[in-house]
Design a protein with these regions (language model features):
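S-adenosyl-L-methionine-dependent methyltransferase catalytic core, i.e., the SAM/SAH-binding region
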Residues: 1-333
Length: 333
């Protein structure tokens, strides 16, 4: 078999060199790749014959590639077709590093069956795998106020109310398709000039809601902390402001010594559980952005675990509103 595993499209793992420098896979160990995707991080780590990878991915298309990895790397590679919030069920506890790449690959974006892009026609989908409902269900079944919350908080869409009102009005005539939703958004924003496509924020909101990305990330990070031993790393690459806000709070809040104040609610932790590996976020170099334009919005954060016993009630409470909005999806299951 060739030294590299062929992929359908040229794949560039984002910030690969920077991640490899941090986690030092030249020294033997076991690593957890929570978003296997097209295998870029895993393959690089497995270049060291003493390294092992356990990989997770919810996308059914990742299974085929994982079989190629199993043939090439044999017992050094193990794959689970699961969401990364389920890493808590792993028996292995000695990971050197746990890696989360929260972006979407080119293959996923241009997969018409997934319906992630507003450039395709047909039925709304946006399911990444192991989902209970689709974007079609969301747009055609939820109430106006529920849609407003999704667009406003998950897409940071300032026209959430107008868009939701038009959705309710138009769906009374027929089930709405991707083209219908794009048309509604364009009509709502016809007098605006945008650097990004007018549909970007609304489609982001639906994708986050359909795939329950907030709860996946919140509990994925908590479970990652519980899995790794002292002096091991959690590495996260984010691509939009909402997920980066969650990761930033997780990293910074638990890497500071805190004192209770009579003016503020009592905190559950007063000592550091993490050490910030990079004090400032790491972003792609101009060369990487030129080679791989979608990487331009990537932000890398890394922490090292230095203490057991963290209580994450404060973390969950911080994003309670977003988690409650996600729970609206239960009525579609």
């Amino acid at each position: 078999m060739s030294a590299t595993i062929n992929l359908e499209k040229k794949h560039f793992p984002v910030l690969l060199d920077e991640i490899i420098k941090i986690i030092s896979p030249r020294y033997s160990g076991t690593f957890l790749d929570c978003t296997f995707g097209q295998g870029g991080y895993s393959e690089k780590i497995l270049e060291n014959p003493n390294n092992k990878i356990i990989a997770f991915d919810r996308d059914i298309n990742a299974i085929r590639l994982s079989e190629l990895f199993k043939k090439k790397f044999e017992e050094r590679f193990k794959f689970y077709h699961k969401k990364f919030s389920e890493i808590k069920d792993l028996e292995t506890k000695n990971f050197k590093a746990i890696i989360f790449d929260l972006g979407y690959s080119t293959n996923q974006i241009f997969d018409e069956k997934k319906g992630l892009s507003f450039n395709f026609k047909g039925k709304l989908n946006m399911k990444m795998g192991l989902n209970s409902f689709s974007a079609h269900d969301v747009i055609n079944k939820l109430e106006k106020e529920e849609l407003i919350k999704i667009f406003k908080f998950f897409g940071e869409e300032r026209d959430a109310r107008k868009i939701s009102q038009l959705i309710i009005k138009k769906r009374s005539q027929c089930f709405l398709s991707t083209e219908d939703l794009v048309d509604i958004i364009n009509k709502t924003k016809k007098n605006y000039n945008f650097k990004i496509n007018k549909s970007t924020k609304s489609f982001q909101a639906l994708r986050i809601f359909v795939n329950q990305e907030i709860s996946e990330l919140v509990f994925g990070l908590i479970n990652a902390y519980k899995l790794i031993p002292i002096n091991s790393y959690i590495v996260v690459v984010t691509f939009h402001s909402l997920e980066d806000k969650i990761v930033k709070f997780f990293c910074k809040n638990y890497s500071e010594n805190k004192k209770n104040s009579r003016y503020l609610p009592e905190t559950k932790h007063t000592c550091k559980f993490f050490e910030l590996v990079n004090k400032k976020i790491i972003t792609p170099s101009p060369d990487e952005i030129k080679r791989n334009p979608p990487s331009r919005s990537a932000k890398l954060r890394c922490i090292k675990k230095i203490k057991e016993g963290a209580n994450f009630d404060e973390f969950i409470l911080k994003f309670k509103n977003l988690l409650e909005i996600e729970n609206i999806g239960k009525k579609l299951c």
